[in-house]
Amino acid sequence: MLSIILKESVRNLGKAGVVTKVKPGYARYLLTQKKAVRATKENLKNLEEQYLVIERENLEKLEAAKALKLSLEDEFLIITRQAADDGKLFGSVTPKCISKLLSDKGYNIHYRNIFFYSVIKYIGEYVVNLELHPDLVLPITLYVVKNDLGAMQAQKLHAEKKRKIEKEVEEGSGTSVDESLKLDSVSDSIDTSGVNSSDKEEENNIIE
């Protein structure tokens, strides 16, 4: 285990300025991503001064995350996977898969900052959480389909939902388009050969 000082809050580890121990592999990730510094004698001695620097950098990162959130709010994801007749996938969809999808769209989000609360093992509609900053998590919609027809239906479904929400917002519901899409995103999946109602019985936080 290696001792580090967190430069920003990290889920399941602690807040900025906390000294903690992690496995070498995770430490390398945190150091490379500039989320932490080594807990050397010099860094520990200057922890108060380090904390002021950490706070300033954290505010800068939060502003950058807010800008990224604005560009991501209209995004949704579609991934094609082979599946059985009952919609069960041959395999599963992982945070690494989501990171690749986002990378293809021009967004660099590490898979460790992507999480969801159920194992994705069926064709259907899901919510994926993107941790853009420890204080800013953005949920976006993911459609898991098994063919091009399913992808077309997912695009149509998403467009219809957005039009519906836009109309409700115009009528004064008080909820933004993107907020409503996230709230509805797991409740109205369509049942076709391409996109089926999902079976989400497992509730662990999946991080891979």
Curated annotation (Swiss-Prot):
- Sequence similarity: Belongs to the bacterial ribosomal protein bL9 family.
Gene3D superfamilies for this protein: Ribosomal protein L9, C-terminal domain (3.10.430.100), Ribosomal protein L9, N-terminal domain (3.40.5.10)
Give the PANTHER family listed for this entry.
50S RIBOSOMAL PROTEIN L9
Q: Which SUPFAM superfamilies match?
A: L9 N-domain-like, Ribosomal protein L9 C-domain
Please give the biological process terms from Gene Ontology that the record holds. Answer: translation
Sorted alphabetically, which InterPro entries does this protein's record hold?
Answer: Ribosomal_bL9 (IPR000244), Ribosomal_bL9/RNase_H1_N (IPR009027), Ribosomal_bL9_bac/chp (IPR020594), Ribosomal_bL9_C (IPR020069), Ribosomal_bL9_C_sf (IPR036791), Ribosomal_bL9_N (IPR020070), Ribosomal_bL9_N_sf (IPR036935)
Task: Tell me which species this is from.
Answer: Ehrlichia canis (strain Jake)
Function, please? Binds to the 23S rRNA.
Q: What is this protein called?
A: Large ribosomal subunit protein bL9
Keyword Ligase in the entry? The reply is no
Question: Would I find Heme among this entry's keywords?
Answer: no
Q: Its Gene Ontology molecular function terms?
A: rRNA binding; structural constituent of ribosome
